[in-house]
Design a protein with these regions (language model features):
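A short beta-strand element within the Helicase C-terminal
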Residues: 111, 120-133, 156-158
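A short beta-strand-to-loop transition that corresponds to the Sensor-1 phosphate-sensing loop
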Residues: 1-6, 61-64, 111-115, 162
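Conserved two-lobed SF2 helicase motor
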Residues: 103-119
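Conserved SF2 helicase motif VI
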Residues: 133-157
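Conserved helicase motor
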Residues: 62-65, 79-96, 113-117
């Protein structure tokens, strides 16, 4: 199952037809996302520091370099994850289990590259904010899909980086 597997499914269908009884489709539901905003990169730190104390945030950054910058600013108040396979930054940050344990964030802020999005979910009622610094539609879908609601009252706000705003 995948929220972003359309291209793969098309390729598979072109090479060999899948029997009807073996195709399963589940609806994508983003009802838990109550509000959506755009942010400029220069405002990110101010926005994060102004969040209510009891609320947590997942921040999907573009690179290991971004993780280093955020670590300079937020220090031990946040967790930082980059794939171990990243040759330049892989071993410089937290292990995934130090960031997310039993599907809950271990720190108020969790900065990560999109590597976190592969096969991982967050079921944490205190995660109320997702900041997505991605521009590819499939990456955005994967990032937004990491937060899984526990019930209808478990909602969040998603902030998409406005790349045009960074030019001003």
């Amino acid at each position: 199952m995948s929220a972003t597997g359309e291209e793969t499914y098309k390729l598979l269908e072109e090479t060999s037809k899948t029997p009807e009884g073996r195709i399963y489709k589940l609806p994508q539901d983003y009802q838990h996302i109550k509000q959506k905003y755009f942010y400029s990169r220069e405002n990110l730190v101010m926005m994060l520091k102004s969040l209510p104390e009891e609320e947590k945030a997942v921040i999907f950054v573009s690179s290991g370099e971004d993780l280093l910058k955020m670590k300079e600013i937020f220090g031990d108040t946040a967790a930082y994850y980059c794939s171990d396979n990243n040759p330049k930054y892989g071993k410089r940050f937290n292990e995934l289990t130090e960031c997310v344990k039993d599907r809950e964030l271990q720190k108020r802020y969790f900065f990560t590259t999109k590597a976190f999005g592969i096969g991982t979910e967050i079921k944490d009622r205190t995660v109320k904010h997702l900041y997505i610094d991605q521009w590819k539609p499939t990456d955005i879908i994967q990032s937004a899909g990491r937060k899984r609601p526990l019930d209808v009252d478990d909602t969040c706000t998603v902030y998409f980086r406005d790349y045009d705003a960074d030019w001003y």
